[in-house]
């Protein structure tokens, strides 16, 4: 048997252990697979990124819409509809006619928040007619009040001019002259001068107690009576 030379064995060993070559087609296929995977990842990222941005924008628009509606609703629907008028004789609770006299009610609410009525005196009390509070002399002369009072029994009584209605004279030029009047009898003939914007719900007895005070010849109370504060309420 022929012996293999050491050099031949070494050469055979090198041939067996040598790495096998990778074909060009295999390399191309691997590169294509990697490219497809990367492209898929990029596409997926862009899709979810755009979806996330759209969601955020939608939520932002929705929040702005809700905020706008909330602000609008506060002015339209959530305005106080009642007020507690605290006087030196007791508490008078009134309902405000927000729909019937919106501009006057808005003005009244604004003045309440500024404490305009705090300390306001009842400057005129006409028995079986009305009580009036204000910081300045009334724009309607006493003679006109009393003359109209004599005629009230002959005129048609409207629902807004019954007893215990809350009103203010028309044609008041500024806030400091804003007066409060509460009728103690039907006054159907003052549509041309009186704006009715509320009615007494509780405290008619307090109004009547104010009505019974002693007055001078100008219908001014001999003893000071006034409003100590007004508290606005959404409900009674």
Swiss-Prot record:
The record's EC number reads 5.2.1.8
Enumerate the transmembrane spans: 22-42
> Where does the UniProt annotation locate this protein?
Membrane
Annotated catalysed reactions: [protein]-peptidylproline (omega=180) = [protein]-peptidylproline (omega=0)
The record, for InterPro entries, names: Cyclophilin-like_dom_sf (IPR029000), Cyclophilin-type_PPIase_dom (IPR002130)
Example GO CC term: the record gives:
Golgi medial cisterna
Q: Which UniProt keywords apply?
A: Chaperone, Glycoprotein, Isomerase, Membrane, Rotamase, Signal-anchor, Transit peptide, Transmembrane, Transmembrane helix
Q: Which GO terms describe its molecular function?
A: peptidyl-prolyl cis-trans isomerase activity
- Gene3D superfamilies for the chain: Cyclophilin-like
Glycosylation site list? 86
Induction and repression of expression: Down-regulated by dark treatment.
Q: How does it sit in the membrane?
A: Single-pass type II membrane protein
Q: Which SUPFAM superfamilies match?
A: Cyclophilin-like
User: Is-annotated flag, keyword DNA damage?
Assistant: no
Catalytic EC class: isomerase
Q: Where is the composition biased (Basic and acidic residues)?
A: 54-67
Q: Which domain of life is it from?
A: Eukaryota
Q: In which tissues is it expressed?
A: Ubiquitous.
Q: Where is the PPIase cyclophilin-type domain?
A: 82-232
Annotated stretches, region: Disordered: 52-71
Pfam families reported for this sequence:
Pro_isomerase (PF00160)
State the similarity comment.
Belongs to the cyclophilin-type PPIase family.
Cited function = PPIases accelerate the folding of proteins. It catalyzes the cis-trans isomerization of proline imidic peptide bonds in oligopeptides.
The protein's name is Peptidyl-prolyl cis-trans isomerase CYP21-4
User: What organism does the UniProt record list as the source?
Assistant: Arabidopsis thaliana
Q: Which gene encodes it?
A: CYP21-4
């Amino acid at each position: 048997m022929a012996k293999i030379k050491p050099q031949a064995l070494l050469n055979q060993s090198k041939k067996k252990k040598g790495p096998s070559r990778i074909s060009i087609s295999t390399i191309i296929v691997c590169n294509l697979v990697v490219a497809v995977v990367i492209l898929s990842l990029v596409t997926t990222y862009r899709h979810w990124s755009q979806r996330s941005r759209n969601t955020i924008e939608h939520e932002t628009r929705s929040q702005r819409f809700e905020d706008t509606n909330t602000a609008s609703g506060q002015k339209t629907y959530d305005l106080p509809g009642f007020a507690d008028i605290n006087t030196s004789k007791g508490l008078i609770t009134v309902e405000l006619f927000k729909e019937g006299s919106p501009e006057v009610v808005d003005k009244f609410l604004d003045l309440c928040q500024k404490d305009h009525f705090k300390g306001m005196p009842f400057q005129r009390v006409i028995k079986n007619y009305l009580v009036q509070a204000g910081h300045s002399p009334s724009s309607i002369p006493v003679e006109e009040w009393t003359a109209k009072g004599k005629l009230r029994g002959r005129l048609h009584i409207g629902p807004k001019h019954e007893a215990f209605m809350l009103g203010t004279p028309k044609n008041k030029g500024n806030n400091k002259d804003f007066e409060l009047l509460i009728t103690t009898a039907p006054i159907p003939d003052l549509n041309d001068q009186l704006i009715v914007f509320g009615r007494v719900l509780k405290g008619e007895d307090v109004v009547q107690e104010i009505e019974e005070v002693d007055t001078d010849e100008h219908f001014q109370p001999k003893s000071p009576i006034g409003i100590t504060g007004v508290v606005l309420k959404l409900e009674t």
